[in-house]
Each structure stands twice: as structure tokens, then as C-alpha cells.
Amino acid sequence: MNILITGGTVFVSRFCAEYFVAKGHDVFVLNRNSSVQSSGVTLLNCDRHDFTALQNTLSGINFDAVIDVTAYTADDVEKLCLAINKRPSCYILISSSAVYPENALQPFGENTTVGVNKIWGDYGTNKIAAENKLLDYYPNAYILRPPYLYGQMNNLYREAFVFECAERNLPFYLPKSSTTRLHFFHIENLCHIIQTIIEKHPDSHILNVGNPASIHIKDWVALCYKVVNDNKPIFYDVDTTLHLQRSFFPFHDYQYELDVTAMMRILDKEKLIDMQTGLKLSYDWYKNNRNKVNSKPYLKYIEENFK
């Protein structure tokens, strides 16, 4: 099967590319060749925003499936849809749970009315526009709305930050009195869902994807410490009226949870990676790939303000 994956150089798109190569598919990655490419892929060297170049690059190539990871606007989607020669049997857009307004009833279901989310701003509204544009061209396309993705190849300084704190045997600083729960999904489980969609074409075309349940931030931090050295973190509360949360903690002060009932009906339960196992996989990757994570100055802020 010929599969086109937009991106292919970092985290979600790179993991997807390597996942489907390992499954024996012919994987084409569309990117500007600014990074070393994964083994086994066919590079389509192009800036997707340059429509003429995109047309020329895709000319003469037919795809059975498209996994669009790097579409952030309606224009991104439209250019790709117009440049594809022959309609693929399956087009999957990786959207985001940022399409749901923060004040909507939770857990967010696929039928929740999408709209502005003040936490995510333009990112969320642009994703809504991308979804709508795709459905204009491909009414039977699939749209996936994940929460926080984590796991191997995660270049964002989220679990990696907590791993680093655990390695240094540091206490952990949490927003004071926070009861926030976070919703996660392991990158390999995302690939399992994509594979299922390509192979089985389920009836549900817009899917929330995520773990069966969210997790309290303190429990999430404790699991990160556990997979590093089996230690239990010492927690300190931080008054967020005095210190901006994002100065010392890798998530916004925002709790949300997705209803993933529809996803659970099609996901092979035996393949579902639990949080501790997923964090262990992430840490094993991180130990040998620290330079691939975009670190933030959280530890510097902590050292200067909380010691």
C-alpha cells in the first residue's frame, strides 16, 4: 500500500512513518528535507505551502492512504487536496482536541459544538477551518482529535522535563492546590487507530482519541519518577498568583477530558498502552535522544526562585 505522510521528520509524523514502514507499506514523506530522513521512507522534497512545487512533486504518484499530520490551516489542506492526482481510498487528518471550547460540557464528545478555545486560540480555530475544508473535498475523510500526545520521539519538553527532575532526585513543584487532570494518548496507540481506519474504514469518521481516562497531574508526575528510578517525588506547592504556571510547569492551567467511547469500540484493547508502560517507553527513548528534545528553562526558573 502506498501511504503519504505529511512531515516525517519529528515526533508524530516521524513515528507514524517508521510505524507503517515496519508494517511493510511503501511510505512517502512530504517535507523540506531539513532533517535526516527515517530509514525505509521515500522522500518527497517539497514545501507544502508552495502549490506549484507541490503539484510537480506529487505528479504521477498515486496513494492508497494519506495521513495528514502537518495541516494547521484550511489553506494547508486545500493545497494538498488539489495537488493529489487520484483520490486515495482513505484520507486521515490529525486534528486536535483544541477545537472544543474550554467552557463546553465535559467530557467533550465528537458532537460537541466546536469553537474558540481561549487557551489554544488561533491554533484551535485554524484546526476547525482545516477540518471543514477537508470535508469540502473529501466528505468521507477521517478526522482524529487527540489530547496531549506522548511517547517515543516526543520533542516537546513535557514528560522529558519530569524525567530530568527524577534523574536529579529533585523535588517537584506543582501549581498550588491544583486539582487538574490531564488527558494523554501514546503515539503508538495513535498509529494503531490510524492502521485500523485504513484497514477497516469504520463508520465513525470524526473520532476523539485518547486514553480511557484522564490522570491527575500529581499521579502523572509520580509515574514519571517511577519509570526513571522508582522513587517517589517530594511535592511543593507554588502560588501561581506569584509565579506564572508555564514558568515552572509544562502544561497550561486547563483541565479537559475527551469522551473516547467511539474510539474504544474500534481499538484492539490488547494493544492499548497504559500510562506507566507508555512513560517507560518514552523514557527509554529519551535516555539516548536528549538532544532531540526542545528543552525549556523550567529548571533555571526553579533554581532561581524556589531554592
Residue ranges and their predicted role:
Residues 79-126, 134-136, 142:
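Conserved Rossmann-fold NAD(P)-dependent oxidoreductase catalytic core, especially the SDR/UDP-sugar
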Residues 242-270, 280, 289-291:
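Conserved C-terminal active-site "lid" loop/helix of NAD(P)H-dependent oxidoreductases
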Residues 131-153:
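Conserved beta-loop-beta element that borders a ligand/cofactor-binding pocket
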Residues 197-254, 260, 299, 306:
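Mid/C-terminal beta-alpha module of Rossmann-like enzyme folds, strongest
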Residues 275-307:
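Amphipathic terminal alpha-helices
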